[in-house]
Amino acid sequence: MDNEKRMTTWCRMWNEDPSLAHDLMTDDCTQWSDHGAGLDTVVGPHEQERFVAGYRARHVNIFSPRVLADAGDRFAYLWDVRKADGQVLTGIDVNHLKDGRVRENWTFVAERRCERSDPEPGAAGHTDPATIEDLCRQWVQLRNGRAELAKDVVTGDFDLFSGAEAAGDAHGPSELADLIERQAETNDPPVITIHRQPIVDPGRRHVAFLWTAETGADGASVGGVDLLTVRSGRFARAWSLTGIRPFRY
């Protein structure tokens, strides 16, 4: 099973067949959700099957995968979920594998749906992994207040989707720089650092990484995730989702 199949099967597990957990997860697979601790105690496929069966008895939600970043033993993807009342939300999952099965999972759900169309599969070509990793470092510097980097880090038609609200979106380097400057002017803006290792997909020119945002006043932190696409050596699209709790691992 490749990672494209894994993301589709993971959605099917939640949509229709909880027993698929046994094909997807290691016996000690752990999960983390950005909005609550409900998955913290769900370890391995047996507990996952029971949990999902109970979840499906209470919720009629349909998950659909959208954009994949595939690094072999790690992958992340953008997805949508349609609720019973017709509301659609966008989310991102990050997965680390062990022996071909998911060992660690992180799940983020936005407050709204990203309505922009997804990049065309296979249209991007190939970018050197070191270039993508360097862009990630510059992106973090940008998010930490270096607004002047926007013109060098993103394309002229860059588009940022914020999972929280439309006020956090940005289109093009000028809007992005203005957004960063406004955020830097707030009281005690958080400092963002990459958590674990970026998921670099040079073939698709996609990258995703977990990050931690920590405030200086009380040291409180929350986990977040960014998924980005690369074109002509710069970021062209970005989806950024922020949780309300710190990472457990």
Predicted regions and their residues:
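C-terminal and inter-domain tail/linker signature
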Residues: M1-Y249
